[in-house]
Amino acid sequence: MDFIMANTGAGGGVDTQAQLMQSAAAAAAVAATNAAAAPVQNAAAVAAAAQLQQQQVQQAILQVQQQQTQQAVAAAAAAVTQQLQQQQQAVVAQQAVVQQQQQQAAAVVQQAAVQQAVVPQPQQAQPNTNGNAGSGSQNGSNGSTETRTNLIVNYLPQTMTEDEIRSLFSSVGEIESVKLIRDKSQVYIDPLNPQAPSKGQSLGYGFVNYVRPQDAEQAVNVLNGLRLQNKTIKVSFARPSSDAIKGANLYVSGLPKTMTQQELEAIFAPFGAIITSRILQNAGNDTQTKGVGFIRFDKREEATRAIIALNGTTPSSCTDPIVVKFSNTPGSTSKIIQPQLPAFLNPQLVRRIGGAMHTPVNKGLARFSPMAGDMLDVMLPNGLGAAAAAATTLASGPGGAYPIFIYNLAPETEEAALWQLFGPFGAVQSVKIVKDPTTNQCKGYGFVSMTNYDEAAMAIRALNGYTMGNRVLQVSFKTNKAK
C-alpha cells in the first residue's frame, strides 16, 4: 500500500493507480497458483516413491522364489542320485548273492563227483510192480531218479513267467524242463505283450525238473524260502503219483470276502500238511475275494479229516457256515458225509431271492417264482425222479461237468458276476458269457459248468427267476436246443 500511495503521490493520476492495482492483483494470482500447485507436485513425488518401493519388493520376492526353486531342483537331483546309487548297490548285492549261489552249487557238484569216484554206486532199484509210482516222500530219498530231480515250487508270484522261473533255477544247475501250472478257465493277457496268445492265469505253483539229482537237492537248500516280490516261495521234491496222495485238493466256499490266504490256511492247518492254498480274487478288486478257495493237503486222508470236521461249520474267522468238499470229484463228498445245503438256502432267504415259495409238486423241485416254476415244469415234468434220470444225459459236458444255461442277462454283464452268483452253490468249473463281436457286450445269455449235479440243480432251483439288476433270469440245464 505504501508503494501504491507513493506512486499515486508522484504521478497523481487515476489511470496510474488502476494499473498498479491490476499489477498487484496479477502478482497475487500468480502466487496463489504457485501455492496451489505445490501439494500436487508433492503427491506425485510420493506416488513415484511408493511405486519404486513396490517394484523393489517384487524384485526381492522374485529373487527369493528363484532361490527356492534352485534349492528344490538341487534337492531333487540329490535324491535321484541317491536312489540310483541305492539301486546300483542293490544290483551289486544281488549279483553277489547269485555268484555265491553258483559257487555253492559248483562246490556241491565237485563234492558229489569226488564221492562218486570213491563210493561204489548202489544197485539200481527194482521196478515197482504194483501199478503205481510208489508212495515216495517229500525229500525224494525213497523215490526214483526222476523224483529226485523233479521239484515242486509253491507260492510263486502271480505275474512270474516260466522263463523267469527257468532263469532263477538255472543258476543252480542244468534244467531239463519247467512247467508253470495255469488255470485254463481264467484267461490271462500279458500286460507287457497284449498281442501274445492268451494263457490261463497262474495258479501260483509249478514244477522244475533238473538233469542231475544233486542240482535239485542244492536248489531246495538254496532257494527254499526265497522272497520274491510279495511272496516267499516253497521249494521241495515233487512226489510220484499214488492213491495215498491223489484227490487231496479241497474246494471251500462261503468264506468272508476279506479273508486272506494265511487265515484260510490257519483253519485247515490242524488237519495235516498243506501243500498249497489259493483264494479266488475278484477281477479288478484287490481287497475282496469271491469267497471261494482251495486247499491241497499232502495226503487224501488229511483232506478227508478236514471235510468231516469243517464242512457246515462256522470257524472263528468266518461269519457263515463254510462248505468243504473234494475239488473236481463229482459226488465224492457225499461218500463221507451227507451234503449240506449252503446256509443262505433257508425259506426266508429263498423268498427274498426268488419271490413266493410254493409247495413242491409230486416231490419234484420246489418252484421259487412263477417263472421258475413254469421253466422247471417244462424241463423236469416228472419232478425230481425225472431230473435224476436226466442226469446221465446232462453229464456229457467237458470233464463230466453239468452245463447250465442262463438267459436274459444285461448287455453289461461280465463273467465275474456269474462266478459270484453260482459259486456259493458248489464247484464251478467254467463260466462263459456269449458276446457280440461288434459291440463286445453280452448277447443276453451265457453258460456255467458245475462239477456236481446236485449242486447244479440246487443253483437252478434258487436262481431261476432271480432278479439281477432289473432283469429276471431264466436258468435251466443246457440242452441240445440251447445255443
UniProtKB/Swiss-Prot annotation:
Q: Which residues form a coiled coil?
A: none
Its GO biological process annotations read:
central nervous system development; embryo development ending in birth or egg hatching; germ cell development; negative regulation of mRNA 3'-end processing; negative regulation of oskar mRNA translation; nervous system development
UniProt keyword list = Repeat, RNA-binding
List GO terms (cellular component aspect): Cajal body; nucleus; ribonucleoprotein complex
A Pfam family in this protein?
Answer: RRM_1
Q: List the Gene Ontology MF annotations in alphabetical order.
A: mRNA binding; mRNA regulatory element binding translation repressor activity; poly(U) RNA binding; RNA binding
Which intervals of the chain are annotated as region Disordered?
120-146
UniProt lists compositionally biased (Low complexity) regions at 120-144
What InterPro entries does this protein's entry cite? ELAD_HU_SF, Elav_RRM1, Hud_Sxl_RNA, Nucleotide-bd_a/b_plait_sf, RBD_domain_sf, RRM_dom
> RRM domain: which residues?
149-240, 248-329, 402-480
The role this protein plays is:
Required for the proper development and maintenance of neurons presumably by affecting RNA metabolism.
Query: Which family does the record assign?
Result: Belongs to the RRM elav family.
Q: What is this protein called?
A: Protein elav
**Organism of derivation:** Drosophila melanogaster (Fruit fly)
Lineage, top ranks: Eukaryota, Metazoa, Ecdysozoa, Arthropoda, Hexapoda
